[in-house]
Amino acid sequence: MPLKFRIKHTLDRMRVGKVKTRHGSFETPVFIPVATLAAIRGLDNRDLKDMGVEVILANTYHLHLRPGDELIKELGGLHKFMNFDGVIVTDSGGFQAFSLGFGMEHGVGKIANNIFLEELREERLREAENERKKLAVVTDRGVRFKDPKSGRIVELTPKKSMEIQSNLGSDIIFAFDECTSPLSDRDYTEKALERTHRWAEECLQHYDRRQALFGVVQGGEYRDLREKSARFMAERDFAGYGIGGSLGKSKQDMLNILDWVIPLLPEEKPRHLLGIGAIEDLFNCTEKGVDMYDCVAPARWARRGHLYVSPAEGGNVRNKFRIHIKNAAFRIDNRPVDRTCDCLVCQNYSRAYLRHLYKANELLYFRLATYHNIYFVVKLMERIRESIADGSFYELKREWLGF
């Protein structure tokens, strides 16, 4: 078996587990940093090891374009290529169909939030006229991408996705799926779900048996479609299950989707909530039974000047547990970013110094900020695991979220 999952502790719907693969193991629930192009900007593998990062996620679509999955295979696979001795997860490339297509056109993500939904839904009817402008177009066969750098057309199909992920040599791979928009109506979501299910069957036929294949539950905000998809995936021999977007119009919609889906998935297999990683979500979704998360947010927010802080430093749901280091208040602030954090940044540098680096656009800022944010989330997940094991999760959640 390319993957073994052992549940060590449970608390209500939560579990602490251990995933074992051919390139090592990791504890769950886990936050997985995203190394899109086989790298996390500003960090090297020694940094990841120092943080305790045991698993990363790389992007199939982007690595296929550059440097090319066949080249990576020639060089011994991703582990050797990037000299990483931990577990590597690759996505299927399906999310790019959304982010480079409808998502790019309308500027929305997996959760719609405060946008003019009905007005934008009407635009779906005019999509055919605008397809030439998009970088990605979905068909029943797969997805056609326009490489934004070279302009060449690339077609990604379920079989091709499995081939690329095999060449990359990752440990955990995902079935090719269509991630619909929060703006998609029921008719489109249902058709997309039928495609996702057909593509999942194709992936089961063509994937590399040395890898652990996860199926992806889709269905948008519609309960019956989500439940249909969860049952479909649960009946197939996947090593684990991803829960994909769209995740509705609000955080509550996302939690409702987890309530519908998770009870229908096999208890003995891991569940991965794709593309989610906000501090609030790590608590609330773990409470629903999620085991794995991946998200670019910690690194992306770091580059934009937002650094994570704990409740002891004023972090809360309203400020999303972040301070913006460019604020003038930090100009003469000799405190570390977070006095409760023992990362190398908080042990050695002040807020004033980090603000100076950020304002001066110094490269060192990006390394230090990214290090702090990823370390912060990785260590928070350690605390969450410990709290599930010793029964103190709800106290920890109350300390952080206030409820």
UniProtKB/Swiss-Prot annotation:
InterPro entries documented for this protein: ArchSynthase1/Queuine_TRR, TGT, TGT-like_sf, tRNA_ribo_trans-like
SUPFAM superfamilies from the UniProt entry: tRNA-guanine transglycosylase
Reaction catalysis annotation: 7-aminomethyl-7-carbaguanine + guanosine(34) in tRNA = 7-aminomethyl-7-carbaguanosine(34) in tRNA + guanine
Binding site for Zn(2+): C341, C343, C346, H372
Keywords assigned by UniProt, alphabetized: Glycosyltransferase, Metal-binding, Transferase, tRNA processing, Zinc
GO annotation, biological process: queuosine biosynthetic process; tRNA wobble guanine modification; tRNA-guanine transglycosylation
Any Gene Ontology CC annotation: cytosol
Note on cofactor: Binds 1 zinc ion per subunit.
Enzyme class of the recorded protein, top EC level: transferase
GO molecular function list: metal ion binding; tRNA-guanosine(34) queuine transglycosylase activity
One of the Pfam families matching this protein, by short name: TGT
Coiled-coil ranges (or none): none
Domain of life according to the entry: Archaea
Region (RNA binding) residue spans: 275-281, 299-303
EC number: 2.4.2.29
Transmembrane segments: none
Cofactor(s) in the UniProt record: Zn(2+)
Assembly mode: Homodimer. Within each dimer, one monomer is responsible for RNA recognition and catalysis, while the other monomer binds to the replacement base PreQ1.
Family: Belongs to the queuine tRNA-ribosyltransferase family.
Function summary: Catalyzes the base-exchange of a guanine (G) residue with the queuine precursor 7-aminomethyl-7-deazaguanine (PreQ1) at position 34 (anticodon wobble position) in tRNAs with GU(N) anticodons (tRNA-Asp, -Asn, -His and -Tyr). Catalysis occurs through a double-displacement mechanism. The nucleophile active site attacks the C1' of nucleotide 34 to detach the guanine base from the RNA, forming a covalent enzyme-RNA intermediate. The proton acceptor active site deprotonates the incoming PreQ1, allowing a nucleophilic attack on the C1' of the ribose to form the product.
PANTHER family: QUEUINE TRNA-RIBOSYLTRANSFERASE
Protein name: Putative queuine tRNA-ribosyltransferase
Organism: Archaeoglobus fulgidus (strain ATCC 49558 / DSM 4304 / JCM 9628 / NBRC 100126 / VC-16)
